[in-house]
Amino acid sequence: MLENAEIAAVVPVSDIDKACDFYGEKLGLKLDVRRDDLPQNQEAEFRAGDGTLVVYESVGAGKSRATVAGFRVADIDATVAELRSRGVAFEDYDMPDLKTENGIVTIGDLRAAWARDPDGNIIAIESRTG
């Protein structure tokens, strides 16, 4: 039923301007629509490939301890390097089942890195080698 539908990640943020700077300027997403005239909160939509990332102001911003959005890229090393040059900091993990090297973990054919937006929402960058 939904296999041909376009997917959208919806991310709560506390400050729409900071979110627009992070997702637009730092991550390089194209701002598609910004709504500052909504009665309860402001929101913005960014294009990412065939999908959409929506950020909206909410008191629930940054409360998830799990990944809220992920981006699949062809070359994770180049992407992480470019994002770092734009000021994005990547998480480092050193746990028995998850250890990053230069901010990137390799699990089978999956390579992934995680960063946080200004509210602490976790964003994943990933690529598959196989």
In which residue ranges do the predicted regions lie?
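Short, conserved charged micro-motifs
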Residues: 18, 76-80
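Short hydrophobic/aromatic beta-strand element in the GNAT-like acyltransferase core
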Residues: 43, 52, 70, 112-113
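Short acidic/glycine-enriched loop/turn segments that link adjacent beta-strands
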Residues: 38-42, 63-64, 98-99, 108-109
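N-terminal beta-strand motif that seeds the catalytic metal site of vicinal oxygen chelate
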Residues: 1-20, 66-71, 126-130
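Vicinal oxygen chelate
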Residues: 2, 71, 81-130
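Residue-level structural signal for beta-strand termini and adjacent loop
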Residues: 37, 58-59, 128
